[in-house]
C-alpha cells in the first residue's frame, strides 16, 4: 500500500479512487451498479468457517488438510494454502508439527489463521501475533473469535448486514489487534471481489 493516497486510479466507469485509511483499512467512495453489488453479496452469503469444536479430530494427512481448509476458504477467492506452504510453516515453527504426519484441530486452527493473515503480515509478525495469543487466550477462544469477527466484517462490507456487531464481552489489546487484522482482510477480499466482478463485466 502506498500511504493514504488513492491506491487505484479511477477509470471511465464513474467510480472514484479507492481511499484506504492505513490504520483501519476503511473503504470509501466506490459506487457500483446494483446488480454488481448483488453478485458480490451472493458470492459471500453462505460463508462460514468451522468453529474449533467442529474441526475434525480424527487427524488429516497433509493433502486432506489442504483440501479441507481451501474448501472453506474458497468463497474468499484469495487465501488458498498449498502443501509446500504448510510444510514451510511447520519447518519455521509457525504452527505445531503434525503428529505421525497427521494434522489435528490445533494445527488446522492455526493454519486457518495463517491463511487469513498471510497476505497482510510478514511471517515474523504472524509468529509474534500467535505468541501474543498463546499468552492471552486459549486457541479455541481466539480461533472462534477470529471466525465470528471475520464473518461479521465480511457480511458488513458486502452489504449483507447494516452494522457491525460487537463480538465478545471483553476488550483487550490482543483482541483489538486481531480485529484490525480481520478488518483489513475483509477489505482486501472485498477489493479482490470488486475487481474480479469488473473484469467479468468487461468480458461480457
Locate each region found by the language model.
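Basic helix-turn-helix/winged-helix DNA-binding cores
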Residues: 24-134
Amino acid at each position: 500500500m502506498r500511504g493514504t493516497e488513492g491506491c487505484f486510479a479511477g477509470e471511465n466507469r464513474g467510480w472514484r479512487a479507492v481511499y484506504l485509511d492505513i490504520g483501519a483499512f476503511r473503504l470509501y467512495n466506490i459506487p457500483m451498479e446494483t446488480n454488481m453489488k448483488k453478485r458480490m453479496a451472493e458470492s459471500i452469503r453462505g460463508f462460514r468457517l468451522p468453529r474449533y469444536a467442529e474441526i475434525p479430530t480424527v487427524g488429516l494427512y497433509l493433502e486432506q488438510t489442504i483440501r479441507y481448509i481451501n474448501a472453506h476458504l474458497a468463497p474468499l477467492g484469495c487465501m488458498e494454502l498449498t502443501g509446500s506452504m504448510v510444510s514451510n510453516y511447520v519447518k519455521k515453527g509457525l504452527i505445531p508439527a503434525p503428529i505421525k504426519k497427521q494434522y489435528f484441530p490445533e494445527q488446522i486452527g492455526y493454519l486457518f489463521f495463517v491463511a487469513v493473515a498471510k497476505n497482510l503480515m510478514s511471517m515474523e509478525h504472524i509468529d509474534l501475533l500467535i505468541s501474543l495469543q498463546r499468552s492471552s487466550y486459549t486457541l479455541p477462544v481466539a480461533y472462534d473469535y477470529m471466525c465470528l469477527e471475520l464473518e461479521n466484517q465480511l457480511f458488513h462490507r458486502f452489504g449483507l448486514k447494516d452494522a457491525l456487531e460487537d463480538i465478545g464481552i471483553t476488550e483487550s489489546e490482543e483482541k483489538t489487534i486481531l480485529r484490525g487484522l480481520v478488518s483489513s482482510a475483509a477489505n482486501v477480499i472485498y477489493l479482490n471481489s470488486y475487481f474480479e466482478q469488473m473484469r467479468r463485466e468487461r468480458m461480457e
